[in-house]
């Protein structure tokens, strides 16, 4: 992890929510970006981890893979009604000009009565999207549309 040991931090943005996620590896920065996104929706500390989803995605570049990863998690939240609290990225690979991710997301089916939402995320955007290698590992910047 970098930036003084933080997993992620929220940054000022006029209309949407912007955050930076940190990790020692690409896998860890993807995990922390997902955690940051779900903490916008709900306090993930209140979520159990009794439901799991396996995720495998391919994208043409690393930035698209991050957007696809977060968008897939948001889709599972909206369609399968699962709110996630933990993310395990097994690997991110580059092969034949494509990037792929193999991961699991752990959470629970949500009930609005017991798990009130804080903010609704409409979409993950490419606006100000960055993934960079740093001296301490990796940093990703993401803006989500609310």
Swiss-Prot record:
Transmembrane segments: none annotated. This is Protein archease. Belongs to the archease family. Keywords: Calcium, Metal-binding, tRNA processing. Activates the tRNA-splicing ligase complex by facilitating the enzymatic turnover of catalytic subunit RtcB. Acts by promoting the guanylylation of RtcB, a key intermediate step in tRNA ligation. Can also alter the NTP specificity of RtcB such that ATP, dGTP or ITP is used efficiently. Pfam families: Archease. GO terms for biological process: tRNA splicing, via endonucleolytic cleavage and ligation. Ca(2+) binds at residues 16, 145-146. GO terms for molecular function: calcium ion binding. Gene3D superfamilies: Archease domain. InterPro entries: Archease, Archease_arc, Archease_dom, Archease_dom_sf. Coiled coil: none annotated.
């Amino acid at each position: 992890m970098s930036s003084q040991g933080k997993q992620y931090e929220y940054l000022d943005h006029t209309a949407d929510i912007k955050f930076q996620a940190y990790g020692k590896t690409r896998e860890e920065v993807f995990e922390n970006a997902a955690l940051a996104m779900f903490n916008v929706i709900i306090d993930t500390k209140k979520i159990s981890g009794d439901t799991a989803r396996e995720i495998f995605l391919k994208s043409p570049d690393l930035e698209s893979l991050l957007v696809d990863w977060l968008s897939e998690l948001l889709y599972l939240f909206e369609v399968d009604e699962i709110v996630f609290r933990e993310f395990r990225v097994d690997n991110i690979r580059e092969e034949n000009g494509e990037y792929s991710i193999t991961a699991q997301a752990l959470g629970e089916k949500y009930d609005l009565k017991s798990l009130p939402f804080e903010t609704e995320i409409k979409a993950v955007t490419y606006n100000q999207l960055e993934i960079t290698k740093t001296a301490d590992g990796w940093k990703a910047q993401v803006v989500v549309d609310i």
